[in-house]
């Protein structure tokens, strides 16, 4: 589950209108099939971490420094996050696919974090791939943060679009700034 609405300042049009709450669950079991994790990539870019922060809240150290009222909410530099995502997400995907020992063209779907449809389209273009391989559901739910990939994966399964043996790349990115991709054989 991911709940970002609690951390957004209601009058901040740069965050409050973008983030929503969502939850999804995926059951993973050993069913005797050859489904497996084939490759992964995880990268952090702390030097740009202030571009997307969760803000300070009651769950943090109560004995720490006093914080300004302004820094208690999620804050985002949308332009910086867009530039980060459109540069680093394709790199992460390429590295994970290479680690998996397959080609980009072997991937049936790239299940990306649903932060922004423009980011998804730009990543597809940078990888020279059709948007048909990049399902999008942000128009239904908004940005549900960490829940967006499992929600999209569950929808693909429910729609009968996934079959045993399909190669999938699941990619998330966000605060920190961080990006991660895992390539699986479904």
Please report, for each region that a protein language model flagged, where it lies by residue.
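Conserved active-site "lid/cap" helical segment
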Residues: 57-108, 119-128, 152, 156, ...
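Condensing-enzyme catalytic core mediating Claisen C-C bond formation in acyl metabolism
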Residues: 11-83, 87, 91, 173, ...
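Claisen-condensing/thiolase-fold acyl-transfer catalytic domains that form or cleave C-C bonds
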Residues: 90, 108-186
